[in-house]
Amino acid sequence: LETNNKDVEVRLINSALVSLRIDGYKVTNPIGFKGKEVVVQLYTAFAPLVHISAIERVCDELQLDLVAIAVEPFAVCRACLGDDIDSSLSAIVMDIGGGTTDIAVVEDGGVEGTKMFSIGGRSFTHQIAERLGLDFEAAEKLKLLADSPNMKPELRRKFDKAVERNIEVWQSGVELAIEDFESENLPGQIMLCGGGASLSAISETLATGDWYKGLPFARRPIVSLIDPEDVPDMVNDTDRELDHTFITAMGLLRVGIDTLLGTGDDKSIKAKLARLLKN
């Protein structure tokens, strides 16, 4: 475990098949292939039992059934992948929340790993409040209006100065987290979601900065916000317009659906292994 604390009791909360290889060749179904070596790559995520017990107690108090516990970036990836067990999606998925930034690398439809660091939207709000002499609520409103063409030039200058340093620190966190994946070739697409991604300076920094040059990208990555309309196998049947800030919730819904339908009749190798991991 990353904590190096052998006394921490943990439980497996998320698992998924990343890839199957026979003698170095990636295959979807190994049946019928001949070879000497079969390599199965798995994604697993664990949580301390003390945290899980706390969640279970909250559910008991609220008289709710605990369907599943999920790592946020894994849930977001599940939303992006949908029901297609043979998806070829390759991307870096970033969920920029209020307190953390969660990053996942997806390669050919498999979640290769997840990382997290503790800088999110609230960090930017606190910096804006401090630099501009505002309370937290006013700073949050100003942050949400950052892209408004009606912002006065002097206020714009102060706002940009307030978030500049935080952007640099956040970018360094992204670099370190992605470097920690130790991937030889990173996907050329970065997909953003979460409330923190609403700050345009974040996507602009990723899309135009030189931060990627020290990492194994073949070229400058393409950066985009995840559109709920592009999330497969999920339909918004309400009158409410959704945006990238709802993707995390859609991901948790996806994991819940996966859990409830975990005894489905999909007979593919990936599906069988996925069900085996859950048991």
Where are these regions (language model features)?
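A general structural motif
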Residues: G97, N166-L176
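A polyampholytic, Gly/Pro-enriched intrinsically disordered region
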Residues: V8, L89-M94, D135-L142, D237-G262
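Nucleotide/phosphate-binding catalytic cleft detector across ATP-hydrolyzing
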Residues: L1-A91, E112, A146-P153, R157-E164, ...
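Glycine-rich phosphate-binding loops at beta-strand->alpha-helix junctions
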Residues: N185-G214
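Conserved phosphate-binding/catalytic loops in two-lobed NTP-binding clefts
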Residues: T208-I247
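Active-site proximal loops enriched in glycine and acidic residues that flank catalytic Cys/His/Asp
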Residues: V105-E107, K115-M116, I178, G194-G195, ...
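Residue-level signature of catalytic and energy-coupling elements of molecular machines
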Residues: C59, D95, I128, L192, ...
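Acidic, glycine-rich loop-and-beta core segments that form the ion-binding/anion-interacting portion
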Residues: L81-P149
